[in-house]
Amino acid sequence: MKKILLLTFLSFLLISCGSSKSSSSSKTTKVERTSKSNSYKKTESIISYAKTFKGTRYKFGGTTKKGMDCSGLVYTSFLKEKISLPRVSRDMAKKGKRLSKDKISKGDLVFFKTNKNKNVINHVGLVVESKRGNILFIHSSSSRGVIVSSLDEKYWRNAFVEGRRVL
């Protein structure tokens, strides 16, 4: 029995932050359309708030400074601007406008498939900078907590699925 529990626990750690607290199906998701100047202000505010979590340890299902998973970071950061997104990365990937890599800009979301055994989006990051094709995003890594990474890093380049614009 202990071996089964240990294997189950290790499995959860290995799948990064792909799933977490399920969002209620009775809740509606509100993605707000805004003017360009208002959108810019909201984008800056969301990114600024997300950066306050840098260094926060990874915690499956976490949404606070005590621990944060990838979708929790994005969910909490957007909620600061009263923008409600689904709580799970694979559901977030259904919102907004799909973007090719060359159209991704600051404030967009980037989605990944990091579990080689499952063909499902299980990781999300928030783009904090996009200059000359170099895309930097903040996310919560299961091994390093909340950090900023580059889409040019081999691991993330290979796991990348799509970008989405929700603002």
Residue ranges of model-derived segments:
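Short, Lys/Arg- and Gly-enriched loop/turn segments at beta-strand edges
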Residues: 117-124
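Short strand-connecting beta-turns/loops that link adjacent beta-strands
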Residues: 104, 117, 131-133
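Catalytic cysteine-centered active-site loop
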Residues: 34-37, 57-106
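C-terminal motif of bacterial Sec signal peptides marking the signal peptidase cleavage site
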Residues: 13-16
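Aromatic- and glycine-rich peptidoglycan recognition patches
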Residues: 18-27, 33-38, 127-167
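Extracytoplasmic/secreted envelope proteins and their assembly/folding machinery
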Residues: 43-51, 71-75, 104, 160
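Sec-dependent signal peptide recognition
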Residues: 2-8, 21
